[in-house]
A protein has these predicted regions:
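Positively charged, small/polar-rich N-terminal and surface patches that mediate targeting and assembly
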Residues: 1-103
């Protein structure tokens, strides 16, 4: 029986990176690996942007991707919500149809 995988994507303020990463690394049972990347947000939603971000026209954010079993997604969201109850952390879930290594 195969495990259903999901990709959990989170966008968070960059200043939350250390706490977010530490929270994920400390989870038990441990999670598979994950990826973080600095990104810039564009468009609407500048109400809480800094003056610097308003002048630049983009908001600095952290992008985090986790591919994990479907059964672990809610556990991750619950733990992060307890450690970082932050209204500017946005998340969504996508199906993973296939995953592997090329070599």
């Amino acid at each position: 029986m195969s495990t259903t995988l999901k990709r959990l994507t989170m966008i968070a303020p960059r200043e939350e990176e250390d706490v977010l990463v530490a929270t994920l690394l400390e989870m038990q049972p441990s999670l598979p690996g994950f990826t973080t990347m600095p990104v810039a947000g564009h468009g609407e939603g500048f109400a809480k942007a800094s003056v610097h971000e308003c002048v630049r026209g983009r908001i600095d954010r952290l992008l985090l991707w986790l591919v994990l079993p479907q059964d672990d997604v809610q556990r991750v969201l619950t733990v992060i919500g307890q450690h970082l109850p932050h209204s500017q952390i946005v998340w969504w879930i996508e199906p993973v149809d296939a995953m592997g290594r090329l070599a």
